[in-house]
Curated annotation (Swiss-Prot):
Residues reported to bind ATP: 75, 93, 106-110
PROSITE patterns: DAC
Regions crossing the membrane: none
Top-level division of the source organism's lineage: Bacteria
Family named by the database record: Belongs to the DisA family.
Encoding gene (name): disA
Cofactor: Mg(2+)
E.C. code: 2.7.7.85
Pfam families with a match to the protein in the record: DAC, DisA-linker
Protein's name according to its UniProt entry: DNA integrity scanning protein DisA
Signal sequence annotation: none
Organism, scientific name: Bacillus cereus (strain B4264)
Any one GO molecular-function label of the UniProt entry: diadenylate cyclase activity
GO biological process entries: DNA repair
Annotated catalysed reactions: 2 ATP = 3',3'-c-di-AMP + 2 diphosphate
């Protein structure tokens, strides 16, 4: 799992350099359209120096036009690590020929070997196939056509909307059951499954956004709007139902996201994530602490909510508390006590109305 996270991080870092809208990508696209092919190395360290033969040092500021003109020559272009300077043009690269390569073309085989030998980012632009391939270490990534990525991103957004609707239904139903005091582990796990799927699709959309660069702004806005408050509410859900009250619920949500990236989770995985044994029955009754519901009451800060839960222990305890009992809690006066009672009543009414709509 750690290896997969590192790979994803590496891809994101690479894509930020060559995403649409960046000067480097503009230059690469110009070379692609001209069908001249090209080989670009980012970084000029001792390892790169040892495999560069010939070429001429120009050490000029990078521009898409310069890249396009210099790529017309047969040799490789050596840029600095950030791609802001062109250091060498028409360089002959001589990597170790004993390094394994899955590529068949000379340009791509050289690119793969240079990347494996030096760890530098190497961009190979195909002359005939109109393909841009990125290499870094053992990583190989082929850039897709922007139109294809946009189509996939829009499809993923539509899928996310469906799972967001599943989340909304599940969290509404859970809220009603919480007020009725009949929650079982099954309902909590069902909602966590919808969180898992939302996070899984979110990660896929983020990968498209990184590859789209400036073309992905609208997709990013849609993603932000769809996920507004969902992750914060999911963290409070975990805080409500985790066996240990002191556990860092944000850290557990992050763990859920990491797991969602690598595997489809079983019910027992989610039960264990909440601090219970994996064999715990899904029919077992569970009681919410009340963080999620009380956080919906307007103008009640987190510190006051913490004081409420510390005093009454559960959501049911808060709901049953009288105005005087609420008034006794530190930071809550008579006015705020009434607001809490009214707020809980409004939330309950809203949940029942949502279920019948």
């Amino acid at each position: 799992m750690e290896e997969n996270k590192q790979r994803v991080k590496s891809i994101i870092n690479i894509l930020q350099l060559v995403a649409p809208g960046t000067p480097l990508r503009e230059g690469i696209d110009n070379v692609l359209r001209a069908q001249t092919g090209g080989l670009i190395v980012l970084g000029y360290n001792e390892q790169i120096k040892s495999i560069v033969d010939g070429g001429f040092h120009i050490n000029c500021a990078f521009s898409p036009a310069s890249l396009y003109e210099l790529a017309k020559m047969d040799g490789a272009l050596i840029l600095n690590e950030t791609g802001s300077k062109i250091l060498i043009a028409n360089a002959q690269l001589v990597p170790d020929s004993s390094i394994d390569s899955i590529e068949t073309g000379m340009r791509h085989r050289t690119a793969e070997r240079v990347a494996k030998q030096t760890g530098s980012l190497v961009v190979a632009i195909s002359q005939r196939r109109n393909v841009i391939t990125l290499y870094q270490g053992n990583l190989r990534y082929t850039l897709k056509d922007i139109g294809v990525i946009l189509t996939k991103a829009n499809q993923a957004i539509q899928t996310l909307e469906k799972y967001k609707a599943v989340w909304n239904d599940g969290i509404t139903n859970l809220g009603i059951l919480e007020f009725e005091e009949v929650v079982t582990m099954s309902e909590v796990v069902h909602v966590l499954h919808s969180v898992e799927m939302v996070l899984r699709i979110k990660n896929e959309i983020l990968s498209y956004i990184h590859e789209l660069g400036t073309e992905g702004r609208l997709i990013r806005l849609q993603l932000t709007e769809l996920l507004a408050d969902l992750e914060a509410e999911a963290a409070l859900l975990i805080k409500d139902y985790h066996q240990e009250k002191t556990q860092d619920h944000h850290q557990i949500l992050k763990k859920l996201q990491d797991l969602a990236n690598t595997q489809l989770l079983e019910d027992s995985d989610l039960v264990k994530l909440l601090g219970y044994p994996g064999q715990t029955s899904l029919e077992e009754s569970v009681t919410p602490r009340g963080y999620r519901i009380t956080s919906k009451i307007s103008r009640v800060p987190p510190l006051i909510i913490e004081n409420l839960i510390n005093r009454f222990k559960t959501l049911q305890g808060v709901c049953r508390a009288t105005i005087n009992e609420l008034d006794d809690v530190e930071g809550i006066g008579e006015v705020r006590a009434k607001k809490i009672r009214e707020g809980l009543k409004r939330i309950q009414e809203h949940l029942y109305m949502s279920r019948h709509n």
